[in-house]
Amino acid sequence: MTNTVLEWMVEDAQRLAECRHDHPFAVLGPQPQEDGTWVLRAWMPEAEGVTLLLGDQEMGMSTPHHPWIFEASVAHDPGCAYRLRVHRGGITHEQHDPWAFRQDWMGEMDRHLFAEGNHHHIWRRMGAHHCEREGIPGVMFCLWAPHARSVSVIGDLNSWDGRHHPMQQRLGGIWELFVPGLAEGQLYKYEIRTQEGHCYQKADPYGFQHEVRPDTSSVVSHLDGFHWTDTDWIQKRDSSNPLDQPIAVYEMHLGSWIHAAADEPFIEADGTPRAPVPAADLKPGARLLTYPELADRLIPYVKERGFTHIELMPITEHPFDGSWGYQVTGWYAPTSRYGTPDEFRAFVDRCHAEGIGVIIDWVPGHFPRDSHGLAFFDGCHLYEHADPRIGEHKEWGTLIFNYSRNEVRNFLVANLVFWFDQFHIDGIRVDAVASMLYRDYLRPDGEWLPNEHGGRENTEAVQFLQQANHVLFQHFPGALSIAEESTTWPMVTQPTDIGGLGFNLKWNMGWMHDMLDYFELDPWFRQFHQNNITFSIWYTYTENFMLALSHDEVVHGKSNLLHKMPGDDWQKYANTRALLAYMWTHPGKKTIFMGMEFGQRAEWNVWGDLQWDLLNYEPHQGVQRMVDDLNGLYKSEPALWRDDFDQYGFQWIDCNDNRHSVISFMRRESTSGTWLVVVANFTPQSHSHYRVGVPLAGYYEEIFNTDASKYGGSNLGNMGGKPTEEWGIHGYENSLDLCLPPLSLMVFKHDPKKSLNPVQE
């Protein structure tokens, strides 16, 4: 060996020992020699001795260059078949050599698609994958960190010592290493050394499972092997238009719906108790439910209530309960607070078996600064903008994704596909879209940068959202993509090919604010604010709107829905019932937050659970019964949902009676031509002879009344229905002479089979 080669070996050994080597394959593993022989070099820090096992041969390996580089000469290329017997710390074990597996994991096409931002299944390459290479089982680790000086895998496999498993840098800033013999369930992180010599320990951005908070390591976890039973559901979903279907969503937070006692642990399939995950310091005796327990309790509850979908506040991994899940660190993993990825799959599968769709909140707008997360990932601003004027949400303390970087955009778009592909979810709600669309969002003058045209629109975020929605519907045509967009940005729910953002639903924030402002008023003053309850119809067909009363309206001192209402307790319940009924009969799909379905009194608390004891009291039972019946009515009457986004589906009868705070309208369905008449009285004053015009003579059955006694009302009504009279009003020749209960909403349906003879009262 020449002095030059010896100097190289000494330098390489020093770089390996100091975790500074970016190409260990150049030194380690089988190395061809000029004379046709091969030298095998094994990197074994702190080993006392290593024996090469090649076929039937055993030969001791020497350390001519460094005490941790063991080598032996062989006549032919040994491939990957050889093993090493390692003696370290008084313990002997055998293993395959990680640096014998030299073939690229990321192929040329993978790298090309990733670099241009179009690898829709990049998670199949990135991250930790249990697989076989050359017939040898193990785990392939793959990471994107283009600015790193070196990267090592650390974890249970090497006592968290970054010297043991340095990764190989490939083209495009990709780092790879196959660790043979590594089993699932192992904890790991990446130790990243920057060009300046700083060392960071990062969780895997593409990790499929992570430790339970407060621990932050990634967990080697498989993707395959779960047996789905929802093929029919998925086929039906993707062959139909969700906008033509009834959608009533139960928004919820899994960790605060209900808790279990910490001394009653979840029992695994093998009979062993699972370590409880504490609910909160404020409830030391409580634990979080597991995904299987939630499936047993939540799914029957939601089905009994009649909701069509569950919307889960973020179930991606997050370190801080107080973020409600909106500060994500594990984008490709369901949170381990409630169990394993396969247990979450089973939860979704059971939802589908019971006819319930699953929507998750997706947060591509920002991410937290936690040291184990994406922030300053490889010593540079890799995932975020370097300039804080476009890279930080100062008010939230989070960082903003750099949507102009192809690989970052690919990370997010593929993540969207991942949740539909791997977990069979049915929809997403994108949080805080307005914060993405505007560069000056929550920023004073001088603390934001204009776009290339001098405007405040974030054109990069617009292009990202368009790409994400285009790719989503390309792969999953029956999906729901819901925007929480609080401004008047145009064409949010229009297709991307005509310049829209590509969502198919948008939360109607204007409707929500107008309704709550109206219902919080003393009923006497409502006559001066009639516009609040009628204005939404003027713009409701500009987008595909979803009406939402969400978690944001029952926190931070806003009180819960029931306590927003004026008056005594009876009026509070009646107002709540009237608001929900108006919501269900107004055009647009529906979402309410957990607890509203039975009149929760307290604000939502992420560290608590719902006030289930309230269901011991009749008024709360009444609200719950009404919501059950509302959902039943809603799903059974296509006039309430078929033409939500067509002007044919709604027609005012009278929206101008502000003196009485009464409105009346029709919901119509184009396929069958059926219609419903809706009449609402938003004051505590009942009316015994209130006339409402209708388009067709006949008998109108009262099919719903929020004032029914079973809901906690005064039981005023119209004896099941009324015939019309030839009394012209509201532009119609026939009308109904109705009794309007206080603070109520009623629904009538024309019944051509019933007699037109007057009903005796």
Curated annotation (Swiss-Prot):
Source lineage: Bacteria, Bacillati, Cyanobacteriota, Cyanophyceae, Synechococcales
GO cellular component: cytosol
Catalysis: reaction(s): Transfers a segment of a (1->4)-alpha-D-glucan chain to a primary hydroxy group in a similar glucan chain
Catalytic residues in the record: D431, E484
HAMAP family xrefs: GlgB
Superkingdom: Bacteria
Gene3D superfamilies: Glycosidases (3.20.20.80), Golgi alpha-mannosidase II (2.60.40.1180), Immunoglobulins (2.60.40.10)
Main enzyme class: transferase
Protein name: 1,4-alpha-glucan branching enzyme GlgB
CDD domains: AmyAc_Glg_BE, E_set_GBE_prok_N
Complex formation: Monomer.
Annotated source species: Synechococcus sp. (strain WH7803)
SMART domains from the UniProt entry: Aamy
Similarity-based family: Belongs to the glycosyl hydrolase 13 family. GlgB subfamily.
Pfam assignment, any one: GlgB_N
The protein's Enzyme Commission number: 2.4.1.18
